């Protein structure tokens, strides 16, 4: 780390970017802070983040993403975790990618990210975009995408569904499925995706899930009951200027001082510092012991022993 700018080292905690990438001339110290996405880009990233948080398998990192890279053009590269070693399904079926591709019956839409379109496939890189916009995102996997995409298309057609990720424009059903609240919360969802490594690098949560409801983006983090929940440290990093999100605490209910582990927990709500009407981030720190079996499955997915130890699963 000698000679490495402190600002870039701090950014790395949020994004998970490698030292090698941050030493690249395209990521100088002047770009150490995390840039804000354009409106279309932010909405697309928020829709992706909403699906990522809706469900995950046993993957090496919370939410199934090892790190993100913010590219020179302001777009995002998202590096996916590989699935468990003994999974019998296709190698991408158990990654977070399984939740993203939109499909539906003619005239309606029912699954995946509305408006997502495949733009380009190149080896292990899949470029996706939002129809009718310049928003782009690159998914980097552990294997190629071509066969998996062909299999997904064949499966959709066999079920009488349309592989909407190939459609030329966004359908009426997809447009109707994008609720007004996700548009208001786009800045928050995008900001969380661009800082997704915080869930692995800061705090003690072994499992993370989230969803949107009204003007709230809700995140639940599961923590071993024998550990310090570490919620203050997590919130401090999440809101640290200029790297974190522009959030301030509005409400807090904490029972972490109780002696019984499973009854301990914390509930916090944060709003935008400059615009409290821009939506609420609700953080729930939930104490729950899932046993050593979970630790073994996460280890089989490539989770590092140091992280498993920190989260109480080894």
Short names for language-model regions:
Residues 33-70, 90-91, 116-119, 125-314:
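Extended repeat-based interaction scaffolds and adjacent low-complexity, acidic/S/T/P-biased segments
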Residues 110, 115-116:
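Phosphate/adenylate-binding glycine loop and adjacent helical scaffold
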Residues 2-30:
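Amphipathic alpha-helical packing elements
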Residues 46, 72-98, 102, 216:
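Long, low-hydrophobicity ectodomains and other hydrophilic envelope-associated domains
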Residues 13, 49, 53-57, 97, ...:
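Generic surface-pattern signal
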